[in-house]
Structures are given as structure tokens and as C-alpha cells.
A protein has these predicted regions:
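A sensor for short, sequence-defined functional sites
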Residues: 1-310
């Protein structure tokens, strides 16, 4: 009951998103509802679709020749971004004046999870510096869900528990509640690095050094559906005292899937008193078919091996 949902300000998914569509139409925008099947519900049949294939309704609006998909049920989803459960490749657009039609539902832009670390090794062996973490779109939504309920002290404690010998001196964030902007977090840190036979060791890939391969099976019968494309860049810079030198750094190299469907690159630069390492891991399409599974799994395997190189 749409009227009741509007009056009571409470409703199910269909009532809320139909109300949203009606509101958009009332403002003279080109809007219509789209029936979809959520990820857990499976794909609807394209050839002979039936109502029982669908279990969810979203809204579609066209503004200045650009199409946006909307869902008003999740307060942490920004304009034009659907909840992850709705990313199931396609849906059925319903125009009550014209025949219904299939429409692709694939996010345009990659979700980013980037990290910048500017560090300095002190004469006493302690490393100090700052880390900036930036997330966008679905990566930002996931991070907001993680940190919104927590105090700054709890966020610091969780960060320190994930990394051996790291102490967080201060923490702050930007745009936590402004969901249309990237979420930016700042950590000021110190690292009790420890001296092992006169050597200091530091993994420049930070949280990615704990990454594990999500693909365990030898073969796969069904597609791998990430839902969205993604990009992860880490830029690491370490300044050294004059009496220190870099013995080794990650080797510059590149890995890539066919048609650039996914890739990993790492580049290292060593100057007189400074080492810089930049790595980028990208998944450039959201859906991989079963015949692409082996190469996708191998990309993850080789990337993780580099992340974990001593």
C-alpha cells in the first residue's frame, strides 16, 4: 500500500522505491521502476521471464541523457549507487506506456581502496609517519559500515591489532557522513621495527600483506561475479637516515589478464636516502566466466605472493 507507506513513513522495498519513482515522475523527470532479482535469488531468465524470477524493485531515472539506478532503502548508499545485493547484471525496466525491456545494471566507475604511506626511519630504528586511506563507492560504503559504529579509540585499537608493532598516535577521518564523497582516513603512526642482525624489515604493502586468495577450488562451474570493478593502489615512501642504505626492495613487475580484464603492477625506485614503492591491483570487469577462472585465480595467487615477499 503506497499511500499507507508514505503516510506512515514505513514500508517494504517495493513500496519505498515505487514511492521514489512516483516522486521523480511528479517532478517531470523521466523515471520508471525496474524489477530485478537480487544476487542471492539468482539470474532471471532472459528468454521467457516470469514474475517469480524477480524479488526486488529499484528505480531508474534519466537526467541529461545519463541513466541512474536508485534505491532509497539504504542510508549509506549515495545517489546513483545501488546496494551490493542489487548488482546482478540486469533487470526488467517497466514503462506502463510502452513494452517492458531488459536493461544492464553494471556500475560505471571502479570502487577504489587506496593507501598512501609517507614514513621516515629514525636513527634509533623507530619508523614514524602518516598513512592516508581513501575509499570510494562500494569500498567506501563497506568501510563506513565498519567504522561508523566505532569510536576513534576503537578504530585505533582495531588498526593496531591488525598490524604487528604499529602504534597509532592519532586518527581522524573526513566525509564519514557525507556519503556522496570519498571516505578519507588519516593515521599518524610509529613502528617499533626492531633490529635483526643490523637489518630493518618493513613490508610496503601494509594491509595487503594479509590478503588471502578467495579462490580455493581447482575448477569452477559458475561465473565469478564481483558485482563491480575495483582498484587498489598503495604508494609507499620511506626516508632513511644518512648512515642507512636500502639493501632490497620489491622487484618492479607487471601481471595482466587477457583483454586487460585484471592486472597488477609494482614499481620500485631507490634514491640516495629514500625508497618508493607503488603497487596497483585492478579488476576491470565485474563478471568472469568459468573458462576465465583459472587465469583469475592465478592472478590472485601471484599478486599475493608478491605482497608477502619477505
Amino acid at each position: 500500500n503506497i499511500k499507507e507507506a508514505v503516510s506512515e513513513k514505513v514500508g517494504n522495498v517495493s513500496e519505498i522505491n515505487i514511492s521514489l519513482t512516483n516522486a521523480l515522475i511528479a517532478t517531470k523527470l523521466n523515471a520508471e521502476i525496474v524489477m530485478i532479482s537480487t544476487r542471492e535469488n539468482g539470474f532471471p531468465t532472459r528468454l521467457y521471464p516470469v514474475m517469480s524470477d524477480f524479488n526486488y524493485i529499484i528505480s531508474k531515472v534519466k537526467i541529461n541523457d545519463k541513466t541512474y539506478f536508485l534505491d532509497a532503502t539504504d542510508k549509506l548508499v549515495s545517489f546513483g549507487i545501488l546496494p551490493f545485493r542489487c548488482l546482478n547484471s540486469y533487470g526488467r525496466a517497466i514503462d506502463f506506456q510502452n513494452p517492458s525491456d531488459w536493461i544492464d545494471i553494471i556500475p560505471e566507475n571502479p570502487s577504489k581502496n587506496d593507501l598512501l604511506g609517507i614514513l621516515k626511519l629514525q636513527e634509533n630504528g623507530i619508523i614514524t609517519g602518516k598513512i592516508k586511506k581513501l575509499t570510494t563507492l562500494y569500498e567506501a560504503k563497506e568501510r563506513r559500515e565498519e567504522v561508523t559504529p566505532l569510536s576513534n579509540d576503537a578504530i585505533i585499537s582495531k588498526f593496531e591489532n591488525n598490524f604487528k608493532n604499529i602504534k597509532v598516535i592519532s586518527y581522524k577521518n573526513e566525509n564519514l557522513k557525507d556519503i556522496d564523497k570519498p571516505l578519507i582516513e588519516y593515521f599518524e603512526i610509529s613502528i617499533e621495527n626492531g633490529d635483526i642482525n643490523g637489518m630493518h624489515y618493513l613490508n610496503p604493502f601494509f594491509e595487503n600483506s594479509k590478503m588471502s586468495n578467495p579462490f580455493k577450488q581447482e575448477d569452477r562451474l559458475y561465473p565469478v561475479d564481483f558485482g563491480y570493478t575495483q582498484s587498489n593502489t598503495i604508494l609507499f615512501s620511506l626516508e632513511l637516515p644518512p648512515n642507512f642504505k636500502v639493501v632490497s626492495a620489491p622487484e618492479s613487475q607487471s601481471l595482466s589478464l587477457e583483454q586487460n580484464a585484471g592486472n597488477f603492477t609494482v614499481k620500485s625506485a631507490i634514491e640516495s636516502f629514500k625508497v618508493t614503492v607503488k603497487s596497483t591491483f585492478t579488476i576491470n570487469k565485474s563478471l568472469f566466466y568459468n573458462n576465465e577462472y583459472a587465469s583469475l585465480k592465478e592472478l590472485y595467487k601471484q599478486t599475493i605472493a608478491i605482497y608477502n615477499t619477505p
